[in-house]
Amino acid sequence: MRGLKDIDTVLRKLAWMREERIWPNGLRYLWTDAFGVVLLASLYDTLKEQKYLDEALWVVAEVKTVLGRKRGIRIGEEPDRDGQYFHYLSMWLYALHVLSRYDAKFKDEGVALARAIHEPFVVPGRGVIWKMQEDLSGPYPGYGFGALDAFDGYVSYRLLDQAALAPQIAEMKALIDAMAGELVITQDLGLGMMLWMTQFFPQEDWAVLQRQRSLGMLDRMWMAEGYFA
């Protein structure tokens, strides 16, 4: 995890979000909470102030209390944020990986969560279901396979514990190998997430290919006025 840039701006934005009760003192939402935990850990690393690590740990405890389920973690606290998204869970696994640098129990929690969600979400040889029912009893109506979910899981699993999650990693790698050659991402968030993931294992074939392809797509999407189309 690299140090933050422009700390003053980050702190101003974080203070504003607190004042507006957006985050971390707003309603729980797993995607935002995962990124926020990583941000707080980065602030702790950069500024060496214990309050940021303490707040990250508080967010983790709140997520468990509010969104935690017998298997997995609900999408969000609002009534319409039911079900479970695999890519949200994968980002949460990454946040637990980051916190495991300070307390090994978070690696154990991450491994346990990965094992709990893997089988319900993953259809070997086909893909990773994008959204599941809240109890993981089956796919959420109207949802199929996610385009990047196998990549999400592969990266998060490997960062957490390659030995403990070896069978799950192998299944994700097989899915990646089957789809990476044909996958073309044209959506801005997807491009950003793919480029972020390629940094962790940059020499692997899928990472080399997708980094080149994603950067090329960004060049084609860039408009002279300074916007993406």
Language-model features: where?
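Glycan-recognition and catalytic cores of secretory/periplasmic carbohydrate-active enzymes
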Residues: 1-229
